[in-house]
């Protein structure tokens, strides 16, 4: 009976969160598709150059949201509602402060950021426009991530999913309207993206009006330990998102030297396509997180292990399905983002996908196990896994392998890195098994 209960709860949380994350990945793909159709290879290159800043904004939002919501879920399972509300208040304050910093950065420093990220020639103007608008919507991204995580951990994954899907599909519709009928170019693309968290927040506000939430704004004084607790748990989410931006930046630099802007556009096709699979893995991990944190809070080890087992099995099945889809439909997938029918871009994207996507089997496992460690307050293993796969191993691996095997070496760096980190993750789990 307990086993059925564990599986039922996991299926409910994970499936709803995966649906929401698929929606997010679809709007990222739609963004790339519409930009490719409307602005060609230069537009896709500008979009890819700006990704590190998006990763930073989304990463800090998840750091606050996941870190705060994990502590909130633990306190809630222990019946400590006042402590949970203090965590929420501190998280909200952090989101507002960081959002204001992003807004000011976008308003006054978008051009230096564009050039620092490697924008050159015809893509500088488009990258600057994209970054300016993206950063000025920073407060909404931070608040959306924070509220989404807290509401999901307060027992309402359905509303969390509804908000994510509504924001994502609104972005897809607005993308088309702004880029094509209204001919707003790259500004239209990022305006659609910026409005997405605004729309999502409108949906999430329903939760507050219903007055069913367990978290409230309270007077908070001398909350240094609360801030530390949020950051120590949430930094794993920040590193995950920020690392993806660092990897994109490093890969862009390497590929620019090997194959120019066309090579970067080919990498954009691969990176944006892989976002779908990674988003599903993240959805599984985030779906299991409230259950793991609550079980950890009351010391229910059977539930902890059951949720981890279901997460890993789900991840392996998804990885196999995605890889088979890539193997059989490589050409049409690459062609979707190659609106100018550039032969070299098509060839590089096809070759890269077949190699790059072998890493999914290991990356999914690493995402699941690092999230498991973070949700159960095992900070060192969680951060070590995330840092290794995020940039400490993959960036030098990409530089070394590109020297040895050119562009093929760049594509191989991802699966090789994820395999090594998966082996290390297993060692961490075995060493911590008696504590789990």
What annotation goes with each model-predicted range?
Residues 2-39, 52-67, 71, 96-103, ...:
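N-terminal transmembrane alpha-helices
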Residues 56-59, 171-175, 200-205, 275-279, ...:
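Hydrophobic transmembrane alpha-helices of multi-pass small-molecule transporters
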Residues 1-17, 72-137, 183-235, 292-358, ...:
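Short alpha-helical transmembrane segments in multi-pass integral membrane proteins
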Residues 12-31, 133, 144, 167, ...:
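Transmembrane helical elements of multi-pass membrane transporters/channels
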Residues 44-104, 141-160, 266-330, 363-382:
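Small-residue-rich hydrophobic transmembrane alpha-helices
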Residues 26-45, 114-121, 177-184, 245-272, ...:
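Helix-terminus/linker motif at the lipid-water interface of multi-pass membrane proteins
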Residues 17, 21, 33, 70, ...:
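Transmembrane alpha-helix boundary and packing residues in multipass membrane permease domains
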Residues 65, 133-152, 160-171, 189-204, ...:
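Short runs within selected transmembrane alpha-helices of multi-pass transporters and secretion channels
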């Amino acid at each position: 009976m307990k086993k059925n209960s564990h599986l039922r709860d996991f299926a409910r949380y994970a499936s709803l969160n995966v649906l929401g994350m698929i929606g997010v990945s679809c709007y990222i793909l739609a963004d790339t598709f519409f930009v490719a159709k409307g602005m060609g290879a230069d537009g896709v290159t500008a979009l890819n150059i700006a990704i590190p800043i998006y990763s930073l904004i989304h990463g800090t939002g998840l750091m606050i949201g996941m870190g705060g919501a994990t502590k909130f879920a633990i306190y809630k399972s222990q019946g400590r509602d006042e402590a949970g509300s203090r965590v929420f208040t501190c998280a909200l304050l952090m989101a507002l402060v960081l959002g204001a910093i992003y807004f000011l950065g976008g308003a006054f420093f978008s051009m230096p950021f564009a050039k620092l990220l490697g924008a050159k020639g015809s893509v500088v103007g488009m990258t600057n426009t994209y970054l300016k608008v993206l950063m000025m919507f920073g407060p909404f991204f931070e608040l959306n991530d924070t509220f989404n995580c807290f509401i999901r951990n307060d027992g309402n994954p359905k509303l969390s999913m509804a908000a994510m899907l509504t924001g994502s599909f609104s972005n897809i519709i607005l993308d088309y309207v702004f880029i094509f009928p209204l001919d707003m170019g790259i500004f239209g693309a990022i305006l659609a993206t910026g409005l997405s968290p605004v729309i999502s927040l409108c949906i999430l506000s329903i939760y507050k009006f219903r007055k069913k939430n367990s978290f409230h704004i309270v007077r908070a004084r001398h909350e240094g330990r609360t801030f530390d607790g949020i950051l120590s748990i949430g930094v794993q989410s920040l590193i995950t998102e920020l690392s993806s931006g660092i990897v994109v930046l490093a890969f862009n630099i390497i590929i620019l030297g090997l194959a120019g802007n066309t090579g970067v556009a080919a990498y954009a096709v691969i990176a944006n396509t892989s976002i779908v699979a990674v988003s599903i893995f993240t959805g599984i991990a985030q779906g299991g997180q409230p259950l793991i944190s609550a079980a950890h809070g009351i010391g229910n080890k059977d539930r902890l292990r059951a949720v981890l087992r279901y997460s890993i099995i789900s991840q392996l099945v998804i990885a196999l399905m995605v890889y088979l889809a890539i193997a059989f439909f490589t050409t049409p997938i690459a062609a979707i983002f190659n609106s100018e029918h550039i032969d070299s871009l098509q060839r590089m994207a096809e070759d890269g996908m077949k190699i790059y996507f072998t890493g999914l089997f290991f990356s999914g496992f690493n995402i699941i196990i690092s999230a498991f460690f973070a949700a159960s307050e095992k900070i060192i293993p969680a951060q070590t896994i995330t840092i290794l796969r995020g940039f400490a191993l993959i960036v030098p691996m990409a530089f070394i392998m590109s020297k040895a095997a050119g562009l093929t070496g760049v594509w191989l760096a991802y699966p090789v890195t994820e395999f090594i980190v998966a082996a290390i993750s297993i060692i961490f789990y075995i060493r911590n098994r008696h504590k789990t």
